[in-house]
């Protein structure tokens, strides 16, 4: 109980919006607590841990997005998603809600009006000392009036490394104009070659921009 309570307390303002649709009979916080305890915890008989894959930091009837990416680069988390406006009740003007939870430090950073659904991208600045920590990321949406909220989705985090040196193995993530994610994972080639491959899609100075080039 205390584990879930501590997690939700850390993101209480986010939960207040994220569970607004369920705040008529009981508080948004209590609604989130109820869901988490029923659906998003693991227990070995003596210890309870949160299943962050099943956890929902928002829940509601608004159409969510079903795929997206989260990329850590130069002190910020870059979020990209497919704009599914027009499907169900999803609208271009829906507001993106971003959340990054630092599991090691047990603190969170979030933005409940980071971008429009139609933007397809947003960024969230992070503290410099978070780079080596385990980060949990969630993406959700709410309607303009805030009355409808989507179920959140957890995004796995990719790390975009600097393209420097001559022979190191790298994992480089490139966000290209098609809004698809291309990953060169642990390539056994020199970094300048990777940089040349990426230059087809991106100027090297723009590798950490979340917005696809036009």
Segments from the language model and where they lie:
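Short intrinsically disordered, low-complexity coil segments enriched in acidic
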Residues: 1-4, 162-167
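Compositionally biased, intrinsically disordered low-complexity regions enriched in proline and serine
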Residues: 20, 36, 102, 111, ...
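Long, polar/Ser/Thr-enriched low-complexity segments
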Residues: 1-60
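Charged linear interaction tracts used for macromolecular binding and regulation
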Residues: 34-163
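Context-gated lysine
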Residues: 9-12, 20, 26, 38-39, ...
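Short, low-complexity, charge-dense intrinsically disordered segments
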Residues: 165-203, 207-210, 214
């Amino acid at each position: 109980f205390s584990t879930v309570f501590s997690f939700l307390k850390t993101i209480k303002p986010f939960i207040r919006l994220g569970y607004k649709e369920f705040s008529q009979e009981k508080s948004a916080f209590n609604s989130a607590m109820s869901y988490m305890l029923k659906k998003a915890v693991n227990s070995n008989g003596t210890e309870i841990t949160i299943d962050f894959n099943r956890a929902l930091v928002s829940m509601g009837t608004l159409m969510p997005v079903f795929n997206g990416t989260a990329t850590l680069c130069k002190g910020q988390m870059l979020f990209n998603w497919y704009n599914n406006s027009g499907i169900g009740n999803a609208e271009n003007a829906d507001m993106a809600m971003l959340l990054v939870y630092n599991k090691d430090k047990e603190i969170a950073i979030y933005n409940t009006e980071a971008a429009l659904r139609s933007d397809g991208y947003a960024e969230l600045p992070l503290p410099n000392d978070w780079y080596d920590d385990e980060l949990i990321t969630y993406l959700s949406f709410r309607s303009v009036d805030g009355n409808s909220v989507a179920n959140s989705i957890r995004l796995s985090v990719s790390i975009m490394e600097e393209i420097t040196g001559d022979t190191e193995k790298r994992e480089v993530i490139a966000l290209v104009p098609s809004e698809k994610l291309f990953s060169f994972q642990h390539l056994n080639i020199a970094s300048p070659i990777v940089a040349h491959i990426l230059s087809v899609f991106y100027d090297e100075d723009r590798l950490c921009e979340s917005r696809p080039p036009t």
